[in-house]
């Protein structure tokens, strides 16, 4: 089989796995928040014109990302179809990354790059959200596609007009994806590098400026400056932008050796500089995780462009082992997500029928997922997942009664005359007295320590009396 065809099959398998996972993933968090635009108790759009107005408000008050605006309308589609669209996004991102690395005809190197993308990108940071699929996977693939196209020669004026429109849209997808590319391409032009098509680059740059300097993005940038960073600057970079840091070191070496000008004028140099700029934008947010998505992807292209002659000689048995691991990982993720989705459906139906928000059930905890899933799955939210719980409450019109999940044993452990403290069989504690050292963390729950373990204290009311459910806190990667 020609290696080009083998690479296409590899990309297809990755895309199918992503589609199956997303089809099994329930809507939650931001997905429900955006769904509320067209449905639910707070719906305020019921026409194309309303959607345009909502997009304008989003550009002014939230962010200027076209990915979000498009996503709002596409939520009207059946979930299976939306999952298929996102699977195509995944294929696009992988395909463009492999093409720009020059690996379309090198199956071994392409397989290793695909493995790095599957295991090293921050998929764990809520990438199972359809909203994040649009914001990061789709935006990344579209911006890389546009980067290739601005250096291509249109076949006709009509083709040029079509590409210009699409490049404008690509530039508006996400500021951390398009703006660094625009700066890097501009520098390349200044240094007498390969000239892009002026019309296509102008369209892409216009879209990028529209999102980067939208009022919503500017307000977000100002607000992020007042927030406490997730970690120190160095640790932020190491955790979110490790590959981009390697590229930054390479750029410094090129400067020292006097080769920066020629390097920056090349397409690989453009992506290297874009990676570092995107890294700076992401680190300025102070958030660990998906903020490094674009910087890392661009960095992978640069790194694999240089190392592909070496890794292409990787023994077939190692490549086969990598592919087997990738397949095992994808299968485990899909299987586990299907299990969690069944539990979530049970939880959501019980919550919708509940008059006080209380749901009894022994649902799978987030930390029970097999390591091989790499935190890419989601089920019933934990007690400290306040935002996820409130989004569900808002979409179901039950803001006054957000979900409170209690172990099934509470039904028999807490009777009408219960007072005091009882330890359940799973180790959780039910008490009628709030722990003295309990400190409020977010709306609706408190934090305490039990034998050195950080625990969530969740108040609930039964038989007209207030009780407290104390359980170990499970911090998910990506929690802010």
Question: What would you call each of these model-derived segments?
Answer:
Residues 90-99, 186-190, 243-265:
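Hydrophobic, aromatic-rich transmembrane alpha-helices
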Residues 110-118, 199-206, 260-283:
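Transmembrane alpha-helix segments characteristic
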Residues 157-162, 202-205, 261, 309-332:
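Signature aromatic-anchored transmembrane alpha helix within multi-pass, membrane-resident enzymes
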Residues 180-205:
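Perimembrane helix-loop-helix junctions
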Residues 61, 65, 108-151, 173-174, ...:
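Membrane-interface micro-motifs in multi-pass membrane enzymes
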Residues 4-60, 66, 72-92, 101-106, ...:
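Intrinsically disordered, polar/acidic, low-complexity terminal segments
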Residues 159-175, 181:
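Membrane-interface alpha helices of multi-pass inner-membrane proteins
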Residues 143-160, 195:
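Membrane-interface transmembrane helices that cradle and orient dolichyl/undecaprenyl
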């Amino acid at each position: 089989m020609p290696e080009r065809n083998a690479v296409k099959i590899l990309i297809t398998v990755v895309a199918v796995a992503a589609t199956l996972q997303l089809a099994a993933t329930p809507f939650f968090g931001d997905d429900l928040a955006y769904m509320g635009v067209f449905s639910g108790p707070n719906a305020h759009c019921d026409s194309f014109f309303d959607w345009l107005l909502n997009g304008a408000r989003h550009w002014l008050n939230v962010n200027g990302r076209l990915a979000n605006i498009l996503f709002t309308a596409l939520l009207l589609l059946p979930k299976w179809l939306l999952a298929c669209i996102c699977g195509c996004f995944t294929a696009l991102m992988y395909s463009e990354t492999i093409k720009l690395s020059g690996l379309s005809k090198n199956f071994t190197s392409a397989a290793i790059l695909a493995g790095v993308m599957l295991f090293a990108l921050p998929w764990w940071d809520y990438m199972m959200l359809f909203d994040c699929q649009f914001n990061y996977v789709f935006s990344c693939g579209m911006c890389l596609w546009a980067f290739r196209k601005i250096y291509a020669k249109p076949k006709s004026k009509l083709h040029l007009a079509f590409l210009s429109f699409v490049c404008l849209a690509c530039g508006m997808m996400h500021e951390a994806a398009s703006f660094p590319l625009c700066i890097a391409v501009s520098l390349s032009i200044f240094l007498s590098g390969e000239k892009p098509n002026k019309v296509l680059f102008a369209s892409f740059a216009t879209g990028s400026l529209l999102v980067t300097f939208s009022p919503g993005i500017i307000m977000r940038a100002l607000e992020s400056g007042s927030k406490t960073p997730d970690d120190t600057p160095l640790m932020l970079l190491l955790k979110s932008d490790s590959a981009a840091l390697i590229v930054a070191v390479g750029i410094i070496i090129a400067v020292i050796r006097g080769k920066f000008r020629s390097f920056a004028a090349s397409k690989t140099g453009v992506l290297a500089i874009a990676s570092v700029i995107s890294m700076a934008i992401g680190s300025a947010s102070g958030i660990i995780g998906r903020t490094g998505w674009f910087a890392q992807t661009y960095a992978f292209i640069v790194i694999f462009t240089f190392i592909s002659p070496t890794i292409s000689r990787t023994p077939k048995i190692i490549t086969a082992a990598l592919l087997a691991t990738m397949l095992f990982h994808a299968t485990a993720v899909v299987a586990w997500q299907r299990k969690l989705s069944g539990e979530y459906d049970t939880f959501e139906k019980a919550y919708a029928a509940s008059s006080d928000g209380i749901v009894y059930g022994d649902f799978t905890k987030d930390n029970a997922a097999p390591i091989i899933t790499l935190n890419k799955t989601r089920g019933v939210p934990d007690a400290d997942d306040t935002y996820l719980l409130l989004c569900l409450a808002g979409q179901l019109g039950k803001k006054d009664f957000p979900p409170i999940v209690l172990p099934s044993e509470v039904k028999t452990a807490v009777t009408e005359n219960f007072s005091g403290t009882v330890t359940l069989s799973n180790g959780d504690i039910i008490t009628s007295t709030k722990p003295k050292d309990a400190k409020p963390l977010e709306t609706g729950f408190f934090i305490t320590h039990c034998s050195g373990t950080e625990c969530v204290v969740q108040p609930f009311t039964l038989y007209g009396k207030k009780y407290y459910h104390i359980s170990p806190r499970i911090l998910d990667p990506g929690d802010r």
